[in-house]
Amino acid sequence: MNHWLRRLLPIAAVLSSAGALMANQVGAMAYTSGSTGYDISYPQCGGPYPSGGFGIVGVNGGYPFVYYNPCLNDQYSHTTNAALYINTGYDPSYTQVDGKHSTAECVTQSATITGSSAHQAAWAVGCSEASRSIAYATSQGASSPSSWWLDVETGNSWSSTDLSLNQYTIQGIVDTLLRQAPAAVGVYSTAYQWRTIVGNLPVSGVLADWVATGSTSAGRARATCGTGFSGRPVWFVQYLHAGFDTNYTC
């Protein structure tokens, strides 16, 4: 993942609250406060691997849908306690059922979502982003991550006129991850970017924040452990060290 330079909506399928709680508990136990790890993706293809107690590997190639990390299998297999992150976004073109974007299955599921037809279409976009990312990760042998993370950044496409479309998209991703690949789900962003993309609109099912600090100082990054953006606890703060995105566990 490039560092920062580079409530409640209905869930489409019925989730077991006990199962979701178990996934969250398992995810929380996977990380030890004070430990450090890293995140890598397609920009690190062919390069050396950093060391750390855990790693978070990118599934996509910077954008949702048609771009994927060609080195996912190798990076995931070389990563201790590997988690996965997916790129996210919303654009009207993503609502097309064209074999690349929204899936017919997600569009069908979206009919159960309370909201306008545009909201349902946005939820289906998120559902499809998650489904296609899960399918690609599974095809690359990355099928049991310790947690899933949504990369929510302004560098990708989002609606600037109706933030609820972004909200429904993100909710669709979270709902689908919890249903198809049960594990803790968190969000990578900054307070500014999260506010720009979803404002104060709620997203349910998110367990934790992963904060991009843009800092090269571990000390300054650690000082932001109490400053999240979604209202959830901060699990990780990211900073740049020795050419790699490094993550400190709060």
Question: What do the PLM-derived regions correspond to, one by one?
Answer:
Residues 29-50, 201-250:
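Functionally critical loop-and-helix segments that line ligand-binding/catalytic clefts
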Residues 18, 76, 134, 174-178:
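Non-transmembrane alpha-helical segments in soluble domains
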Residues 1-28:
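Secretory targeting and sorting signals
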Residues 31-169:
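Substrate-binding cleft of extracellular glycoside hydrolase catalytic domains
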Residues 107-122, 167-175, 203-229:
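Acidic, His- and aromatic-enriched active-site or binding-groove loops in soluble protein domains
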Residues 72-75, 98-104, 197-203, 222-226:
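Short, aromatic/basic amphipathic alpha-helical patches
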Residues 178-196, 207-213:
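Aromatic-lined carbohydrate-recognition surfaces of secreted/lumenal glycan-active proteins
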